[in-house]
């Protein structure tokens, strides 16, 4: 069901050796009352004595902003940045931001760890698309887990050549992952439908969902801008 180029998987799996692991868990209840739990194992890579890189936490520099709305920072009249994980309140935060700053046209994603509420996150993505907002990952940007769906929501999407994206399978409270459900089960179709709504053709929507599920929830698959461009149309790389 999930066929991916072995060479791509080998390349991504060998990007860097793990020196240690950090495990984080997040839980949420969707609109149907179903309780979900996602556990992420973060690889910590020793780059030099005394330093480490933890992909599960945001270490982006402070964004200079003129206003804050939940995880969103308003940079100026036409630009905002996502600076933290999203949650159940994020769609309302986004709506409030646009009411106060209706001229915002670009959402920057610098160091985005993901979401603690997948249902709200997909709703937020559709709001970004409906508002006609572009998404951009600048040089050195890192977009992980549920934040990838928000990047894909941009009406125009751009990412620097060195931008990185982390994906993995979801996990419910009973320990089930996508492959434990039929391919046409509502929980699986919801993501494919979302990717279709974000502009992917049927083949790419299914292939990208398969890619995100090619590693279990407790692992992370790293992608880079050219990898993502195989599935979703991107504009010229950020900063070029």
Predicted regions mapped to residue ranges:
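Small-residue-centered hinge/linker elements
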Residues: 27-102, 111-116, 162-203
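Bacterial N-terminal signal peptides
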Residues: 6-15
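Positively charged n-region of N-terminal signal peptides that target proteins for export
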Residues: 1-4
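Sec/Tat signal peptide C-region and signal peptidase I cleavage site
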Residues: 16-20
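Charged, glycine-interspersed solvent-exposed loop segments at helix/strand-loop junctions
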Residues: 174-240
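Short, glycine-/small-residue-enriched flexible loop/hinge segments at domain edges that mediate gating
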Residues: 103-119, 134-140
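Extracytoplasmic/secreted envelope proteins and their assembly/folding machinery
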Residues: 91-98, 121-125, 129, 148, ...
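Glycine-rich beta-to-alpha active-site loop
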Residues: 129-172
């Amino acid at each position: 069901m999930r066929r991916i180029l072995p060479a791509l998987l080998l390349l991504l799996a060998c990007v860097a050796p793990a020196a240690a692991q950090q495990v984080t868990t997040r839980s949420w209840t969707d609109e149907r009352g179903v309780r979900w739990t996602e556990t992420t194992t973060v690889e910590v890579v020793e780059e030099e004595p005394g330093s480490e890189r933890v992909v599960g936490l945001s270490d982006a520099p402070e964004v200079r902003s003129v206003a804050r709305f939940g995880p969103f920072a308003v940079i100026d009249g036409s630009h905002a940045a996502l600076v933290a994980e999203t949650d159940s309140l994020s769609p309302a935060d986004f709506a409030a931001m646009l009411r106060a700053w209706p001229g915002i046209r670009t959402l920057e994603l610098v160091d985005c760890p993901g979401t603690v509420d997948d249902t709200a996150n997909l709703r937020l993505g559709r709001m970004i698309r409906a508002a006609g907002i572009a998404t951009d990952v600048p040089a050195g940007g890192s977009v992980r887990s549920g934040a990838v769906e928000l990047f894909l929501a941009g009406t125009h999407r751009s990412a620097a050549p060195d931008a990185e994206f982390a994906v993995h399978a979801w996990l419910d409270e009973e320990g089930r992952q996508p492959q434990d459900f039929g391919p046409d089960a509502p929980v699986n179709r919801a993501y494919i439908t979302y990717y279709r709504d974000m502009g992917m053709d049927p083949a790419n929507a299914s292939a990208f969902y398969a890619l995100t599920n090619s590693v279990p929830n407790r692992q992370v698959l790293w992608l880079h801008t050219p990898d993502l461009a195989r599935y979703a149309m991107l504009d010229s790389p950020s900063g070029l």
